[in-house]
């Protein structure tokens, strides 16, 4: 049950991160701005809850399974960077390279967690 819920949250975070990357690029190109209270704040709050639940589940996964390629520090970094990614995808106040680095880092670890869940569930 733990791994199924964690898998669903991981897939949801991957989708949010990929949509955020697209939104950032579109916003940078079109100079589109979003209303803080109507759009940005609800999105960040919703994803803050998702990231907190995901981090809790991922840390439990690490404690129970002790995976070789996923560590506590990565999980904590993903939680913080994921929220930064969501926020910056709306406001575009971050350099393109920095945003790209954050996005790639978040997606790398999310995919590593997803692979770890799949590896353990297939045994």
Curated annotation (Swiss-Prot):
InterPro entries xrefs: YppE-like, YppE-like_sf
Protein name (database record): Uncharacterized protein YppE
Gene: yppE
Domain of life: Bacteria
């Amino acid at each position: 049950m733990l791994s199924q819920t964690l898998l669903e949250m991981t897939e949801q975070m991957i989708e949010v991160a990929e949509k955020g990357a697209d939104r950032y690029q579109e916003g940078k190109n079109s100079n589109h701005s979003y209303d803080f209270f109507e759009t940005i704040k609800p999105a960040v709050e919703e994803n803050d809850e998702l990231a907190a639940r995901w981090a809790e589940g991922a840390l439990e996964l690490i404690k129970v399974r002790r995976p070789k390629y996923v560590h506590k520090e990565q999980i904590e970094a993903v939680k913080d960077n994921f929220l930064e990614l969501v926020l910056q995808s709306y406001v575009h106040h971050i350099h393109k390279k920095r945003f790209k680095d954050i996005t790639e880092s978040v997606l790398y670890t999310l995919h590593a967690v997803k692979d770890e869940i799949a590896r353990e569930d297939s045994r």
